[in-house]
């Protein structure tokens, strides 16, 4: 089954699902710590630029879902669906206030003719932000939002891949401090909890991954894409936001690097991967 996760196709995408920001996000979105207020106009501009990079610049077909004021966190579409090849797992987010976000995502993915699996077990919780797919296997963070039963249902859904669980400490999600920066490359933050999680992933895996260590945990959340006309593409946080981490990304000479601002959504725990669901549709379907 290893060919399914062949690194040559890792990062390929044809479509991206995103969702507009509701104005309720500024005051009502969930956040781990009370901090600076969200500048909503700026958040919208940053989100539009992010969507523009994925659509206009990189050529993905954008499926744009409308905002829902009753769902202040709905821009963070990553948490409600895990898509791998032609299958989509509609999750059961750990925060009860977010569960209705899955409805519109399910409709959108049905229109794209993916095989839909719904997480209906009331004992299961899973946020997509806790799911790291490496192209070879899944790592699932066990956090305040994702539990063992959620990880088991993910494993049942994607049977072709090994699934390992990783305890998440001092962070909202597994991908709050790591992500894939290339076909075999894990971007990881420098904090003790991030490094501990990486060690567990390395112990769990039969495969040896390269690592890219960045000083700032949140800057370790980046988006890698393999675009046939452009090659390796990486969306990462800007030098203005994270100068030291940006310097690390700038050493990746084989990648087309696209710095993206995300200062406003980060105030409500949103990182780069949070606001999109990437899908690779076969051309003939």
From Swiss-Prot:
Catalytic activity: N(omega),N(omega)-dimethyl-L-arginine + H2O = dimethylamine + L-citrulline; N(omega)-methyl-L-arginine + H2O = L-citrulline + methylamine
Gene3D superfamilies the UniProt entry points to: L-arginine/glycine Amidinotransferase, Chain A
Keyword Acetylation: yes
Residues that, per the record, bind substrate: 30, 73, 78-79, 98, 145, 268
EC number: 3.5.3.18
GO molecular function, one term: amino acid binding
Domain of life: Eukaryota
Positions bound to Zn(2+): 274
Keywords linked to the UniProt accession: Acetylation, Hydrolase, Metal-binding, S-nitrosylation, Zinc
InterPro entries in alphabetical order: DDAH-like
GO biological process entries: arginine metabolic process; citrulline metabolic process; nitric oxide biosynthetic process; positive regulation of nitric oxide biosynthetic process; protein nitrosylation
Modified residues (N-acetylalanine): 2
Pfam families: ADI
Free-text tissue specificity from the UniProt record: Widely distributed, highest concentrations found in brain, brain cortex and kidney (at protein level).
PTM-bearing positions, type S-nitrosocysteine: 222, 274
Cystine bridges: none
Membrane-spanning segments: none
Regulation: Copurifies with a tightly bound zinc ion. Activated by release of zinc. His and other agents that promote the release of bound zinc ions activate the enzyme (in vitro). Inhibited by S-nitrosylation. Zinc protects the protein against S-nitrosylation.
Residue positions of the active site: 173, 274
Subunit structure: Monomer.
Function according to Swiss-Prot or TrEMBL: Hydrolyzes N(G),N(G)-dimethyl-L-arginine (ADMA) and N(G)-monomethyl-L-arginine (MMA) which act as inhibitors of NOS. Has therefore a role in the regulation of nitric oxide generation.
Protein name: N(G),N(G)-dimethylarginine dimethylaminohydrolase 1
Organism: Bos taurus
Gene transcribed to yield this protein: DDAH1
């Amino acid at each position: 089954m290893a060919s399914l996760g062949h690194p040559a196709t890792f990062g390929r995408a044809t479509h991206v699902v995103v969702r507009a920001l509701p104005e309720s996000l500024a005051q009502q979105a969930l956040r781990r710590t009370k901090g600076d207020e969200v500048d909503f106009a700026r958040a919208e501009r940053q989100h539009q630029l992010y969507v523009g990079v994925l659509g206009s610049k990189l050529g993905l077909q954008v499926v744009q879902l409308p905002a829902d004021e009753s769902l202040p966190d709905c821009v963070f579409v990553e948490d409600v669906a895990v898509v791998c090849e032609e299958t989509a797992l509609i999750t059961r987010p750990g925060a009860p206030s977010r569960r209705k976000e899955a409805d519109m995502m399910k409709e959108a993915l049905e229109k794209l003719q993916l095989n839909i699996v719904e997480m209906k077990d009331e004992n299961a919780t899973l946020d997509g932000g806790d799911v790291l797919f490496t192209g070879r296997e899944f790592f699932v963070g066990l956090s305040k939002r994702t539990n063992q039963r959620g990880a088991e249902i993910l494993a049942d859904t994607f049977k072709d891949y090994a699934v390992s669980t990783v305890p998440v400490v001092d962070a909202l999600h597994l991908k709050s401090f790591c992500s894939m920066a290339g076909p075999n490359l894990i971007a990881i933050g420098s904090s003790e909890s991030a490094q501990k999680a990486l060690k567990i992933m390395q112990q769990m895996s039969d495969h040896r991954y390269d690592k890219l260590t960045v000083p700032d945990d949140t800057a370790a959340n980046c988006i890698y894409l393999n675009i046939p006309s452009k090659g390796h593409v990486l969306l990462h946080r800007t030098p203005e936001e994270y100068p030291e981490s940006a310097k690390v990304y700038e050493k990746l000479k084989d990648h087309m690097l696209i710095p993206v601002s995300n200062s406003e959504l980060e105030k409500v725990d949103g990182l780069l991967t949070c606001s999109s669901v990437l899908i690779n549709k076969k051309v003939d379907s």
